[in-house]
Amino acid sequence: MAQSSLVAAAGRSGRVIGDYAVGRQIGSGSFSVVWEGRHLVHGTVVAIKEIAMARLNKKLQESLMSEIIILRKINHPNIIRFIDMIEAPGKINLVLEYCKGGDLSMYIHKHGSVPEATAKHFMLQLAAGLQVLRDNNIIHRDLKPQNLLLSTDDNDAALKIADFGFARSLQPRGLAETLCGSPLYMAPEIMQLQKYDAKADLWSVGAILFQLVTGRTPFTGNSQIQLLQNIIRSTELHFPADCRDLSTDCKDLCQKLLRRNPVERLTFEEFFHHPFLSDKQSYDFTRSRLDSRTMNDFHSSGSSPSRNIEEISQEDGLPFFLDDDSSGPEGSPSSFKHTSPMKSSYGFSVERREAALSPLKNMDLSSRYSRVSHRAETNNFKFEGHRLSDRSQFKPSSLPDSRSFSTQGRGDSPDSMDQDYVLISGPPVDIPSSSSGSPKPFNYPFKSHSPPVEFIKRNVTNLTAPMPIASATGNNLSRFGSLESQNCIPGTSHGSLDLVDAFEQPSTNSLTRIRSLQKCAAAIAELVHERGENGKHLEAFSIQLVILAIWNQALHICHTQAVSGIEGSLLQDINRVGRNISHGGSEKLLPQIQKEFVQEVERAEELAKFVESDNAKMPDAMEMILQAALALGISGGVDEVMGDAENAGNLYSKAVRLLVFLAVEAQTLILNPPLTLTNSVRYRLRTYIDSLITRLKHLQSHRRTSYPQKQ
């Protein structure tokens, strides 16, 4: 009867996909709709995942194919069964087995904590599925209750691992560096952006077991940063008071799986043979260990009950929007959004080509960005060979001639293991042992079909480590002084120059550093606007990439300080010098920086639309910034001679800001290759800055003399 009604419904709607009549919609995600289907001849109920390929960028398409390959390769009772793939114009339909029991998160939401015997039943099946993945050198990387499906809604249900969009093949002893998965079940080494191996899945298993027997996740937090802080600060795993009846073996397994240090965590073999899983009566783990085979084609005869996707997660098995959990039951503990880092250079990739008409090493757009092909893949615009020319030098009579900046070249970054979210090593930096680590490059996987704001909201919080930032009890003021403390003349809006110490290193005060980066970005943004107004869109785009790198550095600092827990945290900094950034505490600092970053991302995407060809030569942003600074200094001198002191002060201040950026901050940004200044260039920059500040002080002194303050 049910079969005839479904076929009749399909006939009325005209929806038939391959050999399957399409029934009601049972779920939807960011890129797909899931339908209940039934085989027209055999009556087998299936889940049909209809994916609109036009909505997937290249990397998501690769992730989809990766999922298909994994499911096609493995045939195991604890792995979701792949039945068929049916292609249609602009769409791919995945036919999967149908699980009428829903997922484990729905089960936990309905039942709360479960008896230990039930938890063991599910864990034995999860272990069996993981054994198959391990035998095939696969890390799932997104194990969570939402991705564990149940054949029925009872305590004897078969558990099946699903959603392999994040999974990847990992060679034995290999380490990955991508950020994937859901925060509440994510291993701390992943959240801290450290290399990780298959043991990351075991942390997730421990979190799932803990939630099964207690009804709650082992660690919580109002944000991913707070969650990580709680994990780091925890010295032991605490069980709720109402869980005193848990067996010693159960508690022991949870504790050993949830060890913060992966070296101390159980190995897979120790996990498989742990006493808690030693009872084979409820599940024959040995027989189930490895029942996988390679299928010769996409069609697999037979079916078994599978996924009830009443409420499918928004990422829908595709690794872009992470852990939105819009599908989860109301009140589900997985309620906040996952964040992700980004990769390589400072957002884009540009390969160096020899320029015919300029001593600069002009760059080409080697990776197709946004509008050029709308492939929206993970793009890298790399500045190769930052070299500033001798042209248009600012040469006051008292200053030495300017020479070109020198750079230290660097080869291309190694191929990433995962192109969606991967970290690759940044330029080598000498840092003290107390540092949080050297910087790592990042990428912006922009999407042509999704607003950048939505991407950043989900993926911008957890970033790579910044240049070393240590707490400071006082401001480490620049040898150039602070214009703010010198009654800077009106209009010098770029404010304080307390940016560097005697060794021209960035301030060790975290908030002072962020303020410096903010002002540098504002000054450089004027150059972008000016070139955009003059139709020099490629130049504007090149400079805009530097702004993205600046805001990425600010996000680095904010994130590192938030998770460090050291004395002199951002909250203390804000209370001490919290001007221009945030007045509401450290919890408001990161969102404000994120907002700025999002706006700059959108500007970059708009400018990228004007990149007409992959062979367009990318101008050197650092050279343009230097020349702009020198031109501002010259214009300021002209205005001073002409008696326009206020405008001269404005121009001098902007020039100083740009020069200080080149002398200090630019060397700390994630550029490929990194900008390296010789000692002679540093000296010349210092001389320029000193000369300009001398003129500013002269103007200030003249203004005080001309307009004495009333007593």
UniProtKB/Swiss-Prot annotation:
Region listing for Disordered, in residue ranges: 318-342, 383-419
Class of the enzyme per the UniProt entry, highest EC level: transferase
InterPro entries registered for this protein in UniProt: Atg1-like, Kinase-like_dom_sf, MIT_ATG1a/b/c, Prot_kinase_dom, Protein_kinase_ATP_BS, Ser/Thr_kinase_AS
GO biological process: autophagy; protein transport; regulation of autophagy
SUPFAM superfamilies reported for this sequence: Protein kinase-like (PK-like)
Record: active site: D142 (proton acceptor)
GO cellular component: autophagosome; cytoplasmic vesicle
Domain Protein kinase: 20-277
Gene Ontology molecular function: any one: protein serine/threonine kinase activity
Protein's cellular compartments: Cytoplasmic vesicle, Autophagosome
Motif AIM (Atg8-family-interacting motif): where in chain: 421-424
Compositional bias of kind Polar residues: 394-410
Protein's job: Serine/threonine protein kinase involved in autophagy. The ATG1-ATG13 protein kinase complex regulates downstream events required for autophagosome enclosure and/or vacuolar delivery.
Protein name according to UniProt: Serine/threonine-protein kinase ATG1b
The species this protein was found in: Arabidopsis thaliana
